[in-house]
């Protein structure tokens, strides 16, 4: 367990070792969503395991909870879903995702990626709850060509938003290319 008040710099060598071994991936926070993305990286980051199965196994979560759902499992379901999407973005789409959060952390977009000369925000939802307040805040502030939400809901395209089902993430690049 981590000691209270621990900071990322306290674990810098361990984190680098896990990255070098390919066991974790870091998704870097952007100070500003602009091209090229790495130029606007700041010190914040999220860590994801190599595989969503590892996260499930490490959590000690009972398989029945995963299959049937459980109220006690609802918060962790979001973490598992975000892990799955991070894995899909890297492996299936070959993208290097970043993330964005507002200055006072009033809004956060789970992933931000570049395709061609466009930036796309991607919000992840574990259920069919389609409220994406942070995504709307981002859209209103930065006016991307399209905002993307991936959830358990069906494929749906609206004026400013594409809902791409979690099982359809392999189509992400093709969907973005149709806009260019």
Question: Model-found features: residue ranges?
Answer:
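Short small-residue beta-strand/loop micro-motif enriched in glycine and branched aliphatics
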Residues: 67, 120-121
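Structural motif
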Residues: 118-120, 146
């Amino acid at each position: 367990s981590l000691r209270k008040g621990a900071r990322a710099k306290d674990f810098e060598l361990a984190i680098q070792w896990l990255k070098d071994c390919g066991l974790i991936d870091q998704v870097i926070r952007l100070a500003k969503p602009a091209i090229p993305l790495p130029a606007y990286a700041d010190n914040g980051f999220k860590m994801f395991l190599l595989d969503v199965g590892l996260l499930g196994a490490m959590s000690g979560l009972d398989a029945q909870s995963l299959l049937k759902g459980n109220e006690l499992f609802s918060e962790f379901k979001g973490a598992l879903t975000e892990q799955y999407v991070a894995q899909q973005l890297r492996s299936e789409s070959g993208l290097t995702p970043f993330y964005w959060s507002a200055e006072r952390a009033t809004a956060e977009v789970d992933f931000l990626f570049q395709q061609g000369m466009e930036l796309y925000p991607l919000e992840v939802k574990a259920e069919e709850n389609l409220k994406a307040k942070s995504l709307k805040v981002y859209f209103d502030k930065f006016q991307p060509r399209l905002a993307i939400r991936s959830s358990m809901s069906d494929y749906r395209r609206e004026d400013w938003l594409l809902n791409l089902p979690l099982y359809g993430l392999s189509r992400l690049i093709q969907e973005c290319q149709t806009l260019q």
